[in-house]
């Protein structure tokens, strides 16, 4: 095996291991430590509390959001569930959106990602977007939906490649708090 392939193989195995841990019930409630993060923006979604977190430059902001009408991890197209895992923003969409349903902008996620495909998950069209009206908990068809004023605030930070971590329960803690526990 050529030397250049080793780092990519190690990264791929590490990513699969992390994604596999999300199948373990104890790993589903995880804690993100925000201290010392690089300058990259990271978003996280706590489905149980209907919260969207935006972490950047060592600071965390949170917003009300809504996720799928049916609880649990998305498995198949049309199950009305929001997937759980690590996804990335693929692109921003502003053209031909039904304002009442999607607001004025949508950020397309890479669901299903390679790990989802290995697990046999189907479906597509999982976005982070807003609505032309106020949101209520657990009302989406699987997307992560924020209020219009909130998507206007976080949208500029949701660039292509931004990771979006979605889990049943997500805790945001400083490194100091995490070490104390």
Where in the sequence are the language-model features?
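Exported/periplasmic cell-wall-interacting domains
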Residues: 32-38, 81, 93-181
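Bacterial N-terminal signal peptides
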Residues: 12-22
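N-terminal secretory signal peptides that target proteins for export/translocation
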Residues: 1-8
């Amino acid at each position: 095996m050529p030397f250049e392939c080793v780092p990519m193989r190690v990264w791929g195995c590490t990513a699969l291991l992390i994604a596999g841990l999300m199948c373990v019930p104890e790993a589903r409630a995880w804690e993100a430590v925000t201290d010392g993060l690089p300058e990259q923006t990271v978003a996280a979604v706590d489905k149980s509390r209907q919260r969207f977190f935006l972490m950047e430059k060592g600071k965390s902001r949170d917003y009300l959001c809504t996720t799928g009408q049916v609880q649990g991890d998305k498995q198949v197209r049309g199950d009305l569930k929001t997937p759980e895992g690590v996804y990335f923003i693929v692109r921003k969409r502003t053209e031909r959106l039904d304002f009442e349903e999607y607001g004025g902008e949508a950020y397309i996620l890479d669901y299903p990602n390679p790990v989802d495909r290995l697990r046999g998950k189907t479906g597509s069209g999982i976005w982070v977007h807003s609505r032309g009206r106020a949101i209520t908990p657990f009302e989406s068809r699987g997307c992560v939906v924020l209020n219009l004023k909130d998507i206007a605030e976080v949208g500029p930070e949701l660039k292509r490649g931004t990771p979006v971590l979605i889990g049943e329960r997500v805790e945001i803690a400083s490194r100091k708090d995490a070490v104390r526990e």
